[in-house]
């Protein structure tokens, strides 16, 4: 259970800051492109990755939430979890292990490998977005 206060801080402060900082970096990037200032373009990459990743990750996170909890998945997702991890319990254990292993801040992800069509559990540091850094399609993200 996540408190309403934590969710408000996350949404109104953290996520809003990522969006505002991303917008500012994009404006600076547009100016650097217009001026053909390659040094400035390169310097902005880390701000775009961090703040863009924070926006992407939190947008996925909000879409994953359910008012009374999600319970166990059903249908094709449940079948894929059983196929790739053995059981829902085994999936939860592996997801927990990967997520608690994150040092500092980061994300634990359940992602779909578009080539093999298999589910994978991956941890990403900081605000690195899953798809942009691994190519996996994000299905479930846990903010650490």
From Swiss-Prot:
Keyword line: Manganese, Metal-binding, Mitochondrion, Oxidoreductase
Catalyses: 2 superoxide + 2 H(+) = H2O2 + O2
GO MF, one annotated term: manganese ion binding
Q: Where is this protein chiefly located?
A: mitochondrion
What InterPro entries does UniProt report for this protein, alphabetically?
A: Fe/Mn_Superoxide_Dismutase, Mn/Fe_SOD, Mn/Fe_SOD_C, Mn/Fe_SOD_N, Mn/Fe_SOD_N_sf, SOD_C_sf
Tell me which SUPFAM superfamilies the record gives.
Answer: Fe,Mn superoxide dismutase (SOD), C-terminal domain (SSF54719), Fe,Mn superoxide dismutase (SOD), N-terminal domain (SSF46609)
Source organism, top-level taxon: Eukaryota
A single Gene Ontology CC annotation of this entry is: mitochondrial matrix
Cofactors (names): Mn(2+)
Answer yes or no on keyword Metal-binding. yes
In its keyword annotation, does this UniProt entry include Manganese? yes
Where is this protein found? Mitochondrion matrix
Q: How is the cofactor bound?
A: Binds 1 Mn(2+) ion per subunit.
Q: Give the E.C. number(s).
A: 1.15.1.1
**Any idea which positions bind Mn(2+)?**
10, 58, 143
Q: What does the subunit section of this Swiss-Prot or TrEMBL entry state? A: Homotetramer.
Instruction: State the function annotated in the UniProt record.
Output: Destroys superoxide anion radicals which are normally produced within the cells and which are toxic to biological systems.
Give the similarity note: Belongs to the iron/manganese superoxide dismutase family.
Name of the protein in question: Superoxide dismutase [Mn], mitochondrial
From which source organism is this entry?
Answer: Branchiostoma floridae
């Amino acid at each position: 259970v996540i408190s309403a206060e934590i969710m408000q801080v996350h949404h109104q402060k953290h996520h809003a800051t990522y969006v505002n900082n991303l917008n500012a970096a994009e404006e600076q990037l547009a100016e650097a492109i217009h001026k053909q200032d390659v040094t400035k373009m390169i310097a902005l990459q880390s701000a775009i990755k961090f703040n863009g990743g924070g926006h992407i990750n939190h947008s996925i996170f909000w879409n994953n939430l359910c008012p009374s909890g999600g319970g166990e998945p059903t249908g094709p997702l449940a079948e894929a979890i059983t196929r790739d991890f053995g059981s829902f319990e085994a999936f939860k254990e592996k997801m927990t292990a990967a997520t608690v292993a994150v040092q500092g801040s980061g994300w634990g992800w359940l992602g779909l490998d578009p080539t093999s069509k298999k589910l994978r559990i991956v941890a990403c540091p900081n605000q690195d977005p899953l798809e942009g850094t691994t190519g996996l399609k994000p299905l479930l993200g846990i903010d650490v």
